[in-house]
Amino acid sequence: MKIRPLHDRVIVKRKEAESKSAGGIVLTGSAAGKSTRGTVIAVGNGRILDNGNLKSLDVKVGDTVIFNEGYGAKVEKIDNEELLILTESDILAIVEE
């Protein structure tokens, strides 16, 4: 099944949270937390401005992004992967490695 976001929506596959602390301690359960990073797998056409023009999105497919925890809508598992639908404004940063 394919899913295509509309307008300024972005579909993100959440990256797994690190299971070790910086000091090498293995974290379990809630101590590991949920990552607020993910990989963009699809983007909408853009946001419609007040003047009617279409502004393309700054994020692209393949970008690693940081987003606010708790934002977005969870999508039923598609191809056995849990996905999130976010608006571009929910995304705080693009990670450049």
From Swiss-Prot:
Function: Together with the chaperonin GroEL, plays an essential role in assisting protein folding. The GroEL-GroES system forms a nano-cage that allows encapsulation of the non-native substrate proteins and provides a physical environment optimized to promote and accelerate protein folding. GroES binds to the apical surface of the GroEL ring, thereby capping the opening of the GroEL channel.
SUPFAM superfamilies from the UniProt entry: GroES-like
GO terms for MF: ATP binding; metal ion binding; protein folding chaperone; protein-folding chaperone binding; unfolded protein binding
GO cellular component, one term: cytoplasm
InterPro entries registered for this protein in UniProt: Chaperonin_GroES, Chaperonin_GroES_sf, Chaprnonin_Cpn10_CS, GroES-like_sf
Lineage: superkingdom: Bacteria
Lineage, opening ranks: Bacteria, Pseudomonadati, Pseudomonadota, Gammaproteobacteria, Enterobacterales
UniProt xrefs under CDD domains: cpn10
Protein's UniProt name: Co-chaperonin GroES
Family to which this protein belongs: Belongs to the GroES chaperonin family.
Alphabetical list of SMART domains matching this protein: Cpn10 (SM00883)
Cell location: Cytoplasm
Subunit record text: Heptamer of 7 subunits arranged in a ring. Interacts with the chaperonin GroEL.
Record's keyword terms, sorted: Chaperone, Cytoplasm
Pfam families xref list: Cpn10
Single Gene Ontology BP annotation: chaperone cofactor-dependent protein refolding
Organism: Buchnera aphidicola subsp. Baizongia pistaciae (strain Bp)
Chief localisation class: cytoplasm
